[in-house]
């Protein structure tokens, strides 16, 4: 199990980090905070068996809006749909898991 999270930074409006951790999200925020002058804060998260798959799909979906690394310029509507999109990708992962030929996609 792991978490896909959506973080904000009070110095960058409409720019959000989409990442994953297998540990506590609070610890991940502390790690990221040391390299940032702005306050990093949690907006939302999704606990899942498929964190890598979901994160990869988010990054592909929002690639055109990528700023630096895992930070993306998103609209407020996209931020509000974070959980809905996580669930969509999770459902896709479950379908792929049942397909012997597609299992490697989840790794």
State where each predicted segment sits.
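Non-catalytic accessory segments flanking enzymatic or RNA/DNA-binding domains
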Residues: 1-107
